[in-house]
Regions:
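Rhodanese-like catalytic fold shared by cysteine-dependent sulfurtransferases
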Residues: 74-126, 133-166, 171-212
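Surface-exposed charge patches
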Residues: 3-7, 64, 134, 181
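Anionic group-transfer/hydrolysis microenvironments
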Residues: 41, 131-133
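A short, polar/charged loop-to-alpha-helix boundary motif
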Residues: 53-73
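Conserved residues at beta->alpha junctions
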Residues: 50, 54, 170
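Mid-to-C-terminal Rossmann-like scaffold of FAD/NAD(P)H-dependent oxidoreductases
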Residues: 1-46, 50-51, 89, 93-119
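Short, conserved beta-strand edge motifs with alternating hydrophobic and charged residues
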Residues: 15-16, 127-130
């Protein structure tokens, strides 16, 4: 756990990835969220957790075997699994954990965890939500928020301040990563809320408000 890693003063990064238990276009796909702890210097995998209705045990078994075999996060994107739409996706959530970990290691992304958000905002950073207007109206974090949908972001960069640091979020993390890349390439200082709205809502339901 993160607590044990901190107690032992081990360098680590945490990340969360959301995905489906099998191909999303095939009927019956259900959501899962996987958490990975790893050494950002060596890629060593410390541990993993998962929640979901189906298929979580399979992914944790894979990651437990990877740890036993001394695989690192650098190996995860290249792992190949049995594929058929009722049983898996062309890119499995385990592969996506690897890609997300490499983005952190290579400096393409910088994340914060849900429990760090309050402190980061108190330090002066601003919160940017890039979900659609419909998603934003349905539910949002109880924090001061700048709302710019991702498909409008490039045209509305002048509404943001390059002297201001931002924390960006979407529903599950993919769009906020894209927004993070757009903003960094434009000269902004940005971090990504790991797991985004879906994880925050699950971990801190009292921190979310619903409706108009």
């Amino acid at each position: 756990s993160e607590r044990i890693l901190r107690m032992n003063q081990l360098p680590y990064k945490a990340l969360h990835v959301s995905g489906k238990d099998h191909a999303g276009y095939y009927p019956g796909a259900t959501d899962m969220t996987l958490k990975l702890l790893f050494d950002p210097n060596t890629g060593k995998i410390y541990g993993a957790q998962g929640v979901g209705k189906k298929g979580v045990d399979k992914r944790i078994d894979i990651l437990a075997t990877a740890i036993k075999g001394n695989l690192t996060v650098f190996d995860l994107p290249e792992l190949e699994f049995t594929y058929a739409p009722p049983f898996g996706s062309a890119k499995d959530p385990v592969n996506m954990l690897g890609y997300a970990a490499l983005n952190l290691i290579e400096g393409l992304s910088d994340n914060i965890q849900w429990y760090q958000l309050e402190e980061e905002l108190a330090s002066g950073k601003k919160f940017l939500d890039v979900r659609t207007s419909g998603e934003f109206q349905s539910g949002r974090l109880k924090v001061d928020t700048i709302h710019i949908p991702l498909n409008e972001l490039r045209e509305r960069l002048d509404e943001l301040d390059k002297n201001q640091a931002y924390i960006v979020s979407c529903h599950s993390g993919l769009r906020s990563y894209i927004a993070e890349r757009i903003l960094k390439q434009a000269g902004f200082t940005v971090q990504n809320l790991d797991g985004a709205y879906s994880l925050y809502k699950m971990a801190n339901p009292k921190g979310v408000e619903y409706g108009n």
